[in-house]
Amino acid sequence: MTRQRTVPPEAVGVAVLAVHNLAVHRALPAPADAALNLVTAAGLTGFARHAGFSPADLGIDVRHASRGLRAGLGAAAVAAGAVALGAALPATRPYFRDRRVADVGRGEAAYHLAVRIPVATALAEELLFRGVLLALFRRRRSPAVAVLWTSLLFGAWHVLPTIDHYQGNPARDLVADPSRGRRLAVLATSASTAGAGAMFAWLRLRSRSVVAPALAHAAINMSAYLAGRRLVRVGGRRPPRRRSGPRRSPRGGGPRPRPGRPGPAGPARSRGAGPGCGATGGGPGPR
């Protein structure tokens, strides 16, 4: 009698996330990805429960929610402070300036800050990676190995959005060769998000709840979004004019521009204030 081989549950989880990632970034229109994030998170959570994982295994046990809330609020404060410091330092400020948020209206920005970032991105991704995927890997592996694998997969999760949104971040101007700059951006983003994934996993295991990493994740993305929006808007402001009065041309033909100042067409548009396209991804933003 032959032994029937079963597919490891973690392989199912990885396959579902890979298909989801390709569908979001290569097939579906942009507004659909937020809803699909939540659907996939709910679906994989249901799959894990059906496979025998308890709410505590998945970090969704309500008995640990208050502990996760306390740990998450502390981590969120530290994370937001780190983002604010990075946006304030001249050496790292260009990485936060994203021209896609320049023309985003207040209504759309409010949607990103109230729904898209904290719920459809941070909460959904924490349920997927630090909830379901971490539990699936921990069934047959040590916690350290499970954290390593899920963190690397979290870094890979951000490869496609980094490629798609590379043109939106002025940091690309720091590298002359566009293809080399894109590769460096992918490597840097994958490494940084993998590191963040390890930190989120530590919070999840320490607090026994996905609430803690979800709050820290949301704090990073929301503060980065706000910083990018502020930097782009400040960078795109028109410099103030002097109130000394216009200079007349010798023939009396009207005001003449001052030397060194723009002519009637007005000042050139700032490099950091290009057209925005909604949610951010490769730089500071909800992806």
Give the positions of each predicted feature.
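Short helix-capping/hinge motifs at transmembrane helix termini and TM-loop junctions
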Residues: 28, 51-52, 90-91, 158, ...
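Hydrophobic alpha-helical segments of integral membrane proteins
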Residues: 45, 76-80, 155, 201
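Juxtamembrane helix-loop-helix connectors linking adjacent transmembrane helices
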Residues: 55-122, 138-139, 172-180, 234
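Compositionally biased, low-complexity flexible segments
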Residues: 237-287
